[in-house]
Amino acid sequence: TTLRTPIMLKGCETRSLAQEKLLVMALPTHEIMQQDLQKLTLKALSQYKIILSHRYRQYILSAFEEKGIFCDIYCECQDARTALNLAENGLGVAVLPASMQKLTSRVICREIIDVDLTTEILLAWRKERLPAEVQEFLAIW
């Protein structure tokens, strides 16, 4: 199966298939996007209502805590599409994987420059059972 980090895996082997950064996504008219910045800092981001998928909550909070910055998690969604939809409707700024920007033309994205918020897509299988399909895929990957 394919999974996205961060995730706890016990009894599984994994292979990284892709990496991508988490980006700030908001409407072009949102105040955070009006700044003359192509990239943002965590401190700048902390001034706004943050929307995210529950999967990234601890990961993002840890990044803020390491810098000694408080942030406002305005809405924690069950999935990334819901978080994107809320940002599209102007309810805050979403922090989501870069690939999510392909799903909409309504938001623009900015990179967070002072922290590496990267997620991976993993191929995972149980240690004791490696399906033939996975073996074939791993042979060519």
Protein language model features and the residues they cover:
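Hydrophobic hinge/microswitch elements
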Residues: Y56-I108
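Short amphipathic alpha-helical segments
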Residues: S46-K49, C71, T119-L122
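Hydrophobic acceptor-binding patch used for acceptor engagement in glycosyltransferases
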Residues: L23, K49-I51, G92-A94
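Secondary-structure junction motif
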Residues: L3-R4, I32-M33, Q38-L40, S46-K67, ...
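Residue-level recognition of the GNAT/N-acetyltransferase active site
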Residues: L27, S53, R126
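Acidic, Gly/Pro-rich loop/turn segments at junctions of secondary structure
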Residues: T1-Q47, A98-V107, L117
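A late-sequence structural motif
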Residues: C109-W141
